Amino acid sequence: MNKFSVIFKLSFINTIFFYLPVLANNSPVDYVNTLVGTQSKFELSTGNTYPAIAMPWGMNFWTPQTGDMGDGWTYTYNADKIKGFKQTHQPSPWMNDYGQFALMPVTGGVVFEQNQRASWFSHKAEIAKPYYYKVYLADHDVTTEMTVTERASLFRFTFPEEQNSYVIVDAFDKGSYIKIIPEENKIIGYSTRNSGGVPENFKNYFIIVFDKPFQFTAVALDNAIKTNQTEIEGNHAGGIIGFSTHKGEQIHARVASSFISFE
């Protein structure tokens, strides 16, 4: 055995021993990059995927949303703004989605419209795994994290020191409903948005429970904000809740949904 062969083998063994602790602490799922295949658009398909956060055979998936409401290409890698964090059931952009709705944290002024609430983000400040997603929203100085179960999800929003911190709930257009219940730190609603293939009475009912009392409430109908109401139904309904937050304060939201009822 020559000297170079011995050196090579020793180097290989040292490399293996160096990485063994890293490999031992990781599950196979940690090696999945859910951003692969997201550099797609209508004109050119290069994967047609989105970074789904989901359990195997889960009823719902969740994803950051860079596309417009109803756009089958809900997340594209080359986009630079996030407009919401959406519950989705989309198998393919060509088939589109059904029952979708979204949450979005913002700071500063009260807004609802998807482009007004959108925030710049960077892939350098983004973690995308099948079971967990995290991103920093630069315009609002808010970090959003989410994880899921088979039928529910958990959000954690880390806010800056801000008198005007908000979470927007967008039930999307083509028929939706929102009711804010301040005494229970709760928002309920439904989305009927779909691309066909559902029953005539289709609704995706959802309940969102927060762990901090609301200091501000408003609803929106077709992007018009109404501060004197806590319930709205129409083509495009939404809700806005507000808080005063200190630097680094974390607000959690638990989200559950059903195709049957609020119960």
What is each residue range found by the language model?
Residues 1-9:
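Positively charged n-region of N-terminal signal peptides that target proteins for export
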